[in-house]
Amino acid sequence: MVDHKHLNHVKEKLLENNQKYEVSVEDIQKAIDEANPKPQEDLDERKGYRLTWNHYHNLDDIYDYLNYLEVIFPTICTVSTIGSSVEGRPIKLLRISNRNPNNKAMFVEGGIHAREWISPASVTYIISQLTSNYDNEASYIKNLDWYFVPVLNPDGYEYSHNVDRLWRKNRAKNKISNCVGVDLNRNWGY
């Protein structure tokens, strides 16, 4: 992928070196916009929660869905805030549990990379399947405490929805440079 500001330079270098090239997508932003149309009309008609798996959703829709599940399935679902992002957004966790104190834990997170929208969608789909079929699940599923964090990087996720679709990192400010953001799963001390 080549930024339009550098396109002529790249073309010249390719031609100088007798390299063939083909433009696959003329306007990547247009292709991105067409791939994820605004789902507002689809959502306005819905009763209950606003989440579908026909579109990618913003952070508010995902958090509203978690809160909805806590109301609909109060015996198994609990929502809590486990922290906040650098911009002050809550990081929400959904626990699905039969409340057996002997249960082992299963932790599932998504949305660590802002632009990978399929990750929160996959996590919320798993949540949907687990909650809607919980009574029929096998004991090895029900005898776990499930902990889901659908969006571990809420600032980056919202930024990728509203400003820069290809943004990957969080939105942390760097004190010694103008570089914004940290790639969260590459910033561990080990």
Identify the meaning behind each predicted range.
Residues 1-190:
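M14 metallocarboxypeptidase catalytic domain recognition
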